[in-house]
UniProtKB/Swiss-Prot annotation:
UniProt gene name: PIGQ
GO-annotated molecular function: phosphatidylinositol N-acetylglucosaminyltransferase activity
Source organism phylogeny: Eukaryota, Metazoa, Chordata, Craniata, Vertebrata
Chief localization: membrane
Protein name per UniProt: Phosphatidylinositol N-acetylglucosaminyltransferase subunit Q
Keywords: Disease variant, Epilepsy, GPI-anchor biosynthesis, Membrane, Transmembrane, Transmembrane helix
Compartments (UniProt record): Membrane
Function, as annotated: Part of the glycosylphosphatidylinositol-N-acetylglucosaminyltransferase (GPI-GnT) complex that catalyzes the transfer of N-acetylglucosamine from UDP-N-acetylglucosamine to phosphatidylinositol and participates in the first step of GPI biosynthesis.
Annotated S-S bridges: none
Membrane topology: Multi-pass membrane protein
Region (Disordered): 696-748
Organism, scientific name: Homo sapiens (Human)
């Protein structure tokens, strides 16, 4: 039997000692957690293991011995290591040995009890698998440590080999913390053995941050209570608070600080990641704000900005005056209503004159305003950007007024024209029913309405032109403010901590693998297929998992096959038989369908037409075009593999569904055919000729672009290698090619059908 031993990479170079870990009998694997070094007192070791078992609910024990020497272990050391098995009895007893500076490992697993079967070896083969203990513990590959009783039982029963490793390492944190600050009576080596000084500093920082966070949380709660006072909810203050971007950003930053200095512990890793991202975002914001503050107060840049701000405002006002004078003439050669054009132009020019006077009155205070705005950058760059957005809104307030005037005037014109157009057509708007109804008007009403409609229609181009110009100016200001708000939102929501982990430590963002989740009650648990030979001295990637990690394409293919099986109903007049022994509740629909893979050659007609099969789909497998077909229930008869399937090669028509002149004789020689029954039904056979305790399989051979594999493909193991097949009795070997044109080296392609699932 092959045993799997998961060994931490942090213990590869440690001194000799005992292997402390957990034995998983369901997976025949041992998870090594730490190395216990000499010298030690056995009673203290047993007390430590008992405390760890009680705190973590993990069966931690001494699994074996670890020998790390400069050369082969001496005879006395070997006898001493063997004698430790009597002090710490465990079955099996692991013995791992490595030469210092070498790459050769010696791995043994012995049983002190007598072998159960005669001739069985007393030692098992060991497959050594290295894992990074720190990465496994810091990642989210393990299951939650706190689960309800009902979920904990189901989770423990469904965990596979890798999930058991993740769960064991995660729940054994008590063992890793036993010697964080000092070595103690027992000296262990694990992932935290070399970080005692860092652990002490981290513990001191954690204890010092508790009172500080409590004090800051109290101050923030006081500020929140003051801001929620009813005085700030009165009309002027509430209106200004909802319109100013600075107030919104300060409120948002207060929520962030409350979350950061909260003394409540994070319930799950998602909340912890959110809190860490918030801390990183606030630190980045404050750092950028301090950089802006130092830049503004250096070399009297605030005075230069104040001196340049008033001339810029005057220049903008002059450009607006030139634009209005251009509109009061003949803009772009358009004929405007001169009276209305002059009224609107002078109205807007008067507002610009008022705005220039207001700017000149505020010019002595601009430098002081900018100085206080620069001080606000110590709260963060986002606060300074929000203040800049509010300043832009105040400096362009006249443009906003122009846009509102033009929009209201244009809206009145449009509504008036729509009402007069309904009057002109003899219609009216019914306010109660919210619809347009017919209405009879007098002659004077029609005359006045038609006259007003004509006047408004001729005045519409002038109003529309002013509305269009001021709308474009307003859009320009809104675009600038939108860019500023976009930058503020980017700084507030930037997951800087997650990005740093993704670049530096991507294992911290890993989640539980979906392949290790339960597949359902009707499906067997995933199994690991291991090569029969020993893996000592071989690289770990040679241990090929079978059935535990399926590709996405295989998962989708299995889902499609299950959907097709679900649409196959039992035939009329037959009752559903009871479950046969060894089939694990095999469904009736699966017993009513037989699947096969057939080739589609380039120079002829495929053989599935001759056999009357229903094509399900086609795909490319191993560089060979293949089609998946279904044989209906009336074709499901007792079958056996034969080298030929048609009389063109076999000399007799043993299969009535294959014609005499097969269009593709070479392909027919590659197919395991279905033969009519030649014996009566006996006990142990289902009504459709499926032998109980066996799995259905059809093999197809054909050319392969890669190197031909061994006689038995690793994806088609025998019943002894794959216990989930329900007791497979038939040996799935490639069928001989038979006569016909020569083909390249045959390559076995198998479709295996197990109870409750279909696996390629």
């Amino acid at each position: 039997m092959v045993l799997k031993a998961f060994f931490p990479t942090c213990c590869v170079s440690t001194d000799s000692g005992l292997l402390v870990g957990r034995w998983v009998p369901e997976q025949s694997s041992a998870v090594v957690l730490a190395v216990l070094h000499f010298p030690f007192i056995p009673i203290q070791v047993k007390q430590l293991l008992a405390q760890v078992r009680q705190a973590s609910q993990v069966g931690v024990a001494v699994l074996g011995t670890w020998c790390h020497c400069r050369q082969e272990p001496e005879e006395s050391l070997g006898r001493f290591l063997e004698s430790l098995g009597a002090v710490f009895p465990h079955e099996p007893w692991l013995r791992l040995c490595r030469e210092r500076g070498g790459t050769f490992w010696s791995c043994e697993a012995t049983h002190r009890q007598a072998p159960t079967a005669p001739g069985a070896p007393g030692e098992d083969q060991v497959m050594l698998i290295f894992y990074d203990q720190r990465q496994v513990l810091l990642s989210q590959l393990h299951l939650p440590t706190v689960l309800p009783d009902r979920q904990a039982g189901a989770t423990t029963a469904s965990t596979g080999g890798l999930a058991a490793v993740f769960d064991t390492v995660a729940r054994s944190e008590v063992l890793f913390r036993s010697d964080r600050f000092d070595e103690g009576p027992v000296r262990l080596s694990h992932w935290q053995s070399e970080g005692v000084e860092a652990s002490i500093l981290a513990e001191l920082a954690r204890r010092a941050s508790g009172p500080i966070c409590l004090l800051l949380a109290s101050l923030l709660s006081l500020v929140s209570a003051v801001s929620a006072c009813r005085v700030f909810k009165l009309w002027p203050l509430s209106f200004l608070g909802s319109k100013l971007s600075t107030c919104e950003q300060l409120r948002h930053r207060l929520e962030h600080l409350t979350l950061i200095f909260s003394t409540r512990k994070a319930e799950n890793p998602a909340q912890l990641m959110r809190k860490a991202n918030t801390v990183a975002s606030v630190l980045l914001d404050v750092a950028l704000g301090l950089m802006l503050l130092s830049w503004l107060h250096g070399r009297s840049r605030i005075g230069h900005l104040a001196d340049a701000l008033v001339p810029v405002a005057d220049h903008v006002a002059e450009e607006l005056q030139h634009l209005l004078q251009w509109l009061m003439g003949a803009p772009a050669g358009l004929k405007m209503n001169r009276a209305l054009d002059q009224v609107l132009g002078r109205f807007f020019l008067y507002h610009i004159h008022l705005w220039i006077s207001y700017i000149h009155l505020m010019s002595p205070f601009v430098e002081h305003i900018l100085w206080h705005v620069g001080l606000s950058a110590c709260l963060g760059l986002t606060v300074a950007l929000s203040l800049l957005s509010d300043i832009i809104a105040l400096l362009t307030f006249h443009i906003y007024c122009f846009y509102v005037y033009g929009a209201r005037l244009y809206c009145l014109k449009i509504h008036g024209l729509s009402s007069l157009w309904r009057l002109f057509r003899g219609k009216k708007w019914n306010v109660l029913r919210q619809r347009v109804d017919s209405c009879s008007y007098d002659l004077d009403q029609l005359f006045i309405g038609t006259l007003l409609f004509t006047i408004l229609l001729f005045l519409l181009p002038t109003t529309a032109l002013y509305y269009l110009v001021f709308t474009l100016l307003r859009l320009l200001v809104v675009a600038v403010q939108g860019l500023i708000h976009l930058l503020v939102d980017l700084i507030n929501s930037l997951p800087l901590y997650s990005l740093g982990l993704r670049l530096c430590r991507p294992y911290r963002l890993a989640d539980k693998p979906t392949a290790l989740q339960p597949r359902g009650a009707h499906l067997p648990p995933p199994q690991l297929w291991l090569p029969p030979q020993a893996l000592l001295g071989r690289p770990v990637p040679q241990a090929v998992p079978w059935g535990a990690h399926l590709p996405l394409e295989a998962e989708r293919g299995q889902a499609g096959l299950r959907e097709l099986l679900a649409r196959l109903a039992p035939p009329h007049g037959h009752s559903q038989p009871s479950a046969l022994p060894g089939w694990h509740q095999l469904s009736w629909r699966m017993s009513c369908a037989l699947w096969t893979l057939l080739c589609a050659p380039e120079h002829g007609r495929p053989c599935y037409h001759t056999l009357g099969l229903e094509v399900i789909g086609s795909e490319q497998m191993w560089g060979w075009p293949a089609r998946l077909a279904a044989l209906h229930h009336w074709h499901c008869l007792p079958w056996d593999p034969l080298p030929t399937c048609c009389g063109h090669h076999g000399g007799e028509h043993s299969n009535p569904r294959c014609p005499e002149h097969c269009p593709m004789p070479t392909l027919c020689t590659q197919v395991q055919r279905v033969r009519p029954p030649q014996q009566p039904q006996v006990e142990g056979w289902s009504p459709w000729g499926l032998p109980s305790g066996s799995a259905l399989a059809v093999g197809v051979e054909g050319p392969c672009q890669d190197e031909p594999p061994s006689p038995r493909h690793p994806l088609a193991p025998s019943a002894e290698q794959h216990p989930a097949s329900g007791g497979l009795k038939q040996s799935l070997t490639p069928v001989p090619s038979g006569p016909g044109p020569s083909l390249p080296e045959p390559h076995g392609v198998y479709l295996r059908m197990f109870p409750g699932e279909v696996a390629l």
